[in-house]
Design a protein with these regions (language model features):
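Solvent-exposed edge beta-strands and adjacent loop segments
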Residues: 1-55, 59-60, 103-118
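Extended aliphatic helical segments
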Residues: 16, 64, 68, 84, ...
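A generic structural signal for solvent-exposed, polar alpha-helical segments
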Residues: 17, 38-40, 92-93, 106, ...
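Extracellular/virion structural assembly segments
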Residues: 38-101, 132-137, 141
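Mixed-charge, glycine-accented linear interaction segment located at domain edges/termini
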Residues: 102-155
C-alpha cells in the first residue's frame, strides 16, 4: 500500500498481523436480444468490482495498520490509495505485479473480548485500471517500476 503520494510513494506491505485474505469479484452482464437470434440473448460483461479483504490481529506500530485504523477510519477523505499486488517468487527482471488505485473500507477495528487479541478486518476495492510492473525490495525500501509495453508489432 502506498502511504505516500503518487509523486513520492512510500510502499509498505499489507502483511503484518494479517492471517487471511479473500478476493471477491462481482460482475454484472447486459443481455441483448435480436430477432435474428430468435430471442436468445447475447451477453456482455458490463461492470466488475474487485475487493480484497484482509483479516488478522491489530499490530499497533505497523505503518499500514496505523494508517488504516488511525487515519483512514476517522477521515473518509483519506480512503483513496494505491495498491501493488506482486509475487516475490518471480525471477528478477520480469514483471511481477500490478499497481492500481483503490479505496479502503474498515469492517472491524479490533474490538472484542478482553482476553483475546484484537481481531481486525479491512478491505481494498479496485477503482481503476491496473498497470503492470516490477516491485523490488532493496536497501530496506520497496520500489515500483512500470513495465515497458511488451507488445511489439512487427510488420
Amino acid at each position: 500500500m502506498n502511504l505516500g503520494t503518487p509523486e513520492e510513494p512510500d510502499w509498505k506491505p499489507i502483511t503484518v498481523g494479517i492471517s487471511t485474505t479473500e478476493t471477491e469479484i462481482e460482475e454484472e452482464a447486459e443481455d441483448y436480444y435480436y430477432m435474428d437470434g430468435r430471442g436468445t440473448p447475447e451477453s456482455e460483461p458490463a461492470t466488475q468490482k474487485i475487493t480484497r479483504t484482509f483479516t488478522g490481529h491489530r499490530k499497533i506500530g505497523d505503518p499500514v495498520q496505523d494508517m488504516v485504523f488511525d487515519m483512514m477510519m476517522e477521515n473518509l477523505d483519506k480512503r483513496a490509495t494505491e495498491i501493488v499486488e506482486y509475487y516475490d517468487i518471480i525471477p528478477s527482471g520480469t514483471p511481477n505485479g500490478k499497481k492500481y488505485p483503490a479505496t479502503v473500507a474498515v469492517q472491524n477495528d479490533g474490538s472484542g473480548e478482553a482476553q483475546m487479541r484484537a481481531d481486525i478486518s479491512f478491505s481494498i476495492t479496485k477503482t481503476g485500471a491496473s498497470e503492470k510492473g516490477t516491485m523490488t525490495f532493496t536497501q530496506n525500501k520497496y520500489t515500483w517500476a512500470k513495465s515497458e509495453d511488451l507488445r511489439k508489432v512487427t510488420v
